[in-house]
């Protein structure tokens, strides 16, 4: 077991001693599918790439069956131009034209690289200024500002550290979009594949970029841990929505060498 690796990979373990890390892994981490060294990480990544390729092979030559519906992609980015570049590249590869991007920025540097990367691209986009604060989870509120900009169509969140995992992902998603369905799929993270089983959404088995829904349904992102689950749970509870599951791995982390979304803000 590599104690430094284990602690660096999982934000909730950052203050643990080596002895505490050892105890945690044997009592909880191994059962939760956590990774405790680089060799195990590479094994998991290679295994999950095979699973992803097999699951997604059906849509390699996918021919859409329905007219492209309007999809709004909401992106939070801050001080990560390289991540953002990979994120946008995965959107461009979709070749899906009924698309709007809403992108938040909280400083001038971020605004500059957004505009530099998008101004020569054939994309409909709008940038929205947001303000950071001292709350540890203030970035969740950025989603609320982005949501206010959407007037119609469907919504997908795709932060700057995430990307589409297949070039036909949006075409495939579009064919299953209906007003009363909250559509979910699987997500490829560094240490595991995440997604609800049989459409049963629970804390820890859903990610912010693992679903799509009609924008007429409303919910709110709280500034707290597991805000994506809270947002989804309230959305489903307060609206007459059914959960639909696509058995495909349609989004993934941009960097499979770490786990983002746990207070980690480094670029690639």
Name these PLM-found stretches.
Residues 1-49:
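Charge-rich, low-complexity intrinsically disordered regions
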Residues 44-90:
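N-proximal low-complexity "stem/linker" segments adjacent to membrane-targeting elements
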Residues 89-98:
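Short, acidic, metal-binding catalytic loop of nucleotide-sugar glycosyltransferases
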Residues 133-150:
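Glycine-rich, basic loop-to-helix element that forms the pyrophosphate-binding segment
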Residues 153-163:
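Short beta-strand-to-loop acidic/aromatic patch adjacent to the donor-nucleotide binding site
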Residues 162-175:
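Acidic donor-binding/catalytic loop of UDP-sugar-dependent glycosyltransferases
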Residues 183-196:
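Short beta-strand-to-loop element that shapes/binds the nucleotide-sugar donor at the catalytic cleft/hinge
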Residues 200-267:
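Conserved nucleotide-sugar donor-binding catalytic segment
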